[in-house]
């Protein structure tokens, strides 16, 4: 049943959603991914339950007690609304480079070009922030923000 799946051109973290009826695959994508959409799940008080089968990077659920080898079924749901960006250090744990991703994101959002340059905007690509976007409790579209910051720099230089 294609309605219960999200078809992604590319990988789960950096790919884009494809409509099975009218969509197309990206020219440079080397994989196609299908994950459950998650719209068939009905959780009564999902936020208030211990969540033994749910993945959480921040140990918000008790599933971390089951051991590190536990397998999780992840789907495409955001599970909640957008929230304010908080400085929790969760990006630092998964970011592959030695820069301050939270401060860089705040500089990009504020359109502060001098601060973006000082914090290393020239060293990053939106895909570098894919894991940050996955573990983000604020559900911010971090890759889109970084792409906007890089586009702003390009526009300023030309």
Enumerate the language-model features and the residues they cover.
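Redox cofactor-anchoring modules in respiratory/redox and cofactor-processing assemblies
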Residues: 1-158
């Amino acid at each position: 049943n294609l309605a219960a799946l999200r078809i992604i051109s590319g990988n789960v973290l950096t790919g884009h959603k494809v409509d099975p009826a009218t969509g197309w695959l990206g020219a440079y994508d080397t994989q196609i991914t299908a994950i459950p959409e998650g719209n068939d799940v009905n959780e009564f008080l999902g936020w208030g339950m211990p969540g033994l089968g749910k993945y959480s990077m921040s140990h918000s659920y008790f599933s971390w007690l089951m051991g590190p080898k536990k397998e999780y079924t992840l789907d495409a749901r955001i599970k909640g609304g957008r929230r304010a960006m908080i400085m929790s250090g969760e990006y630092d744990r998964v970011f592959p480079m030695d820069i301050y991703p939270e401060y860089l994101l705040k500089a990009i959002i504020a359109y502060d070009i001098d601060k973006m340059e000082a914090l290393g905007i020239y060293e990053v690509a939106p895909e570098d922030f894919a894991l940050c976007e996955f573990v983000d409790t604020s559900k911010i579209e971090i890759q889109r923000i970084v792409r906007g910051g890089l586009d702003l720099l390009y526009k300023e230089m030309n």
